[in-house]
Amino acid sequence: MENYINRTEPDYRWEPTKVLNEPWGTIAHYKLVSQKWRGHVWTHHLVIVRPCSIRNPDIAFLKISGDGDIKNQINSLKILAERSGAVTAVLMNVPNQPFYEGRCEDALIAYTFKQYLKTGDETWPLLFPMVKSAVKAMDAIQDIVKLEHKQQINRFVVNGASKRGWATWLAAAVDKRITAIAPMVIGTLNIKAQLHWSEQIYGKQSTKLKDYTELNLHRNVGNEAMQKLRNWIDPYAYIHRFTMPKLLLLGTNDPFWTVDSLRHYWHDLPEPKLIYQTPNAGHDLNGGDQALQTLAAFLELIADHKPLPKIAWKFNNVANTHINVHIDSNEPVGAISLWSTHSDDLDFRNNQWTAQKLNITRDSSHAKTSIPLPHSGYQAYLRLCLR
């Protein structure tokens, strides 16, 4: 992958298409050509939002996106820009599509994986140009703000959802300008273990992965070519590189992954790291409002060079009747909720989670609670609100 990312791109260029001045800042639109991949020139819509007050001129936020509603994207960028006092941007059309008989999204990614396995041509995997488009977008943002505002950006916070979240992880593995990441609804780290675990929990792979399973990409995971591919496209292969701050934005009912997919990589991820689970949310995070507010707080901390909240917890099983949970934080705890549901197995895709506020000493950096153990099955997680 790194050979592809580092390859010179003669087709790289950008040009302004429209600038809108608003009371709160400016919205600038650009046409970006990131590369030529297998004869196809990749063209993107790049939007850069600049708030009136720039208190953090050295950092920018970049969202990797597909073909979503640009108005909603800009509204989110405005919130993030005003909260962080920094430039924010969205890169659209990742990946460029459709290609190869109308394939899009996972069907296109899976097809390119299969073509690599058939031909051995290392330029095939679609995640390579997806990651490179983000790298070239960062180049363009640096060039644009330096040319137009005499501003030097050295740090990036990168965010993307699903396949774009996958590209977020991989971009952070290869580009040192990325000093924090916030991947959303992507539980693909440690692919081999995830596939094995999904088969155990569901009895088969999730139907959401059918584009991959129909090509039998979940089989022969020990095959030499498959191992080579996995070493390129599995973020877990680069896990030691993820030393930057990380916020994982997930949904409790995401049907792509098991509810405990974190078990296969969380403990191996270097600090600092945080998780936010949107309750009763699938792959779309129920519209993403809770995730956006959490992301805004995360971005503000990173932009202002402030440390992330650090949370540690211990569990004690008491006579197999309940679990005592002890929580320590470097920030005062404003509230703590117990979100729970029950399942006889680990398939939580259709479960309804309910919340119970727990009594704590407000503004203490310590909290403890007791969770009754179910007679059978599985349940529960905790959510903290920090001041």
Residue ranges and their predicted role:
Residues 170-219, 277-280, 285-289:
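Hydrolase active-site cap/lid region
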Residues 117-162, 178:
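Gly/Ser-rich "nucleophile elbow"/oxyanion-hole loop immediately N-terminal to the catalytic nucleophile
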Residues 263, 271-295, 358:
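Histidine-bearing beta->alpha loop at or near hydrolase active sites
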Residues 298-340, 357-370:
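Surface beta-strand/loop "capping" patches
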Residues 242, 248-250:
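Short beta-strand/loop motif that positions the catalytic acidic residue
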